[in-house]
Amino acid sequence: MLVVIPQVLNAEQVGAVRERLEHAGEAWVDGRVTAGYSGAPVKFNQQIDERSDVALECQRLILGMLERNPRFISAALPNIVYPPMFNRYSEGMTFGAHVDGSVRIHPHDGRKLRTDISATLFLSPHDSYDGGELQVQDTYGMHSVKLDAGDMVVYPATSLHQVTPITRGTRVASFFWIQSLIRDDTQRSLLFDMDNAIQRLNQTGADEEARRTLVGCYHNLLRQWSET
C-alpha cells in the first residue's frame, strides 16, 4: 500500500528545516556510510550525520508533527518510528534499485526496529529540480512519486525502489522507517480502508448503531493482528 500524506510540514516548518540543513556544514557526509552491502554500490548522495545537533533538532520537529497527523497514524499504525534522516541529491546523484534493510538499530537507545514501512518526506519544491523521482515497484507495476515540499509518501519497506538521477537542481528530503503495530501490509491496507470508511460515515450521519458495529470490528481486528 502506497499512501501520500499531504502537508506533514507547512511552508514555515519546511523553511525552518531547510535553513538548518543548508547551514549544516560538516554534518553532511557521504550517504554510503549507512548503506548495506547491496545498497552501497548504487547509492550516490549525501546525508546528514544522524547524531548531529542539526539532525536531532529537525527530528524533533518532524516527529512532533507525525504524532498529530491522523492520516499518518491511520496508514502506518506506528509502533516505533526511526528518527528521521536527511539526504541531498545534486546533479548526477542517484540511488539505484534496492530494498531497504529489514532491521535497523535505533541510534539513540539501541533498540532493534523492524522496518515494515519506508517513508520519504519531500523538502524541496517539486519544480526546483529535474529527475529525482522516487520509483517504487510493486505487483501492480512501477509508481513514480515526486511531491511538493512538506508532502510525504509511505510504502512497504519490502518494495524494490530507487531515486532517479538528478539532472538539474538539488533534491533534499527526509527519510525514515516505521515498525508498525501491524507487520502485514495487506492487513494494514484493510484497516486503513475501514478507518477511512468510518470517518466518512461519521461525516454523513449514517446509522449510529451500524457505525458502532463497524468501529468495533476495526478495533477487534486491530486487537487480533497487532504486535506491541
UniProtKB/Swiss-Prot annotation:
Enzyme group, top EC level? oxidoreductase
Q: What is its EC number?
A: 1.14.11.-
Question: Organism's domain of life?
Answer: Bacteria
Q: Name one Pfam family in it.
A: 2OG-FeII_Oxy_3
Which residues are in the Fe2OG dioxygenase domain? 80-180
Q: Which cofactor does it need?
A: Fe(2+); L-ascorbate
Residues noted as binding Fe cation in the record, renumbered to the chain: H98, D100, H161
User: InterPro entries, per this entry?
Assistant: Oxoglu/Fe-dep_dioxygenase_dom (IPR005123), PKHD_C (IPR041097), PKHD_hydroxylase (IPR023550), Pro_4_hyd_alph (IPR006620), Pro_4_hyd_alph_FE2OG_OXY (IPR044862)
Q: How is the cofactor bound?
A: Binds 1 Fe(2+) ion per subunit.
**GO terms for molecular function, please?**
2-oxoglutarate-dependent dioxygenase activity; iron ion binding; L-ascorbic acid binding
User: What GO biological process, any one, is recorded here?
Assistant: intracellular iron ion homeostasis
Residues binding 2-oxoglutarate, per UniProt: R171
Q: Tell me the keywords, alphabetical order.
A: Dioxygenase, Iron, Metal-binding, Oxidoreductase, Vitamin C
The cross-references to NCBIfam families, in alphabetical order and at most eight, read: PRK05467.1-3, PRK05467.1-4
Q: What is the name of the protein in this document? A: PKHD-type hydroxylase Reut_A2877
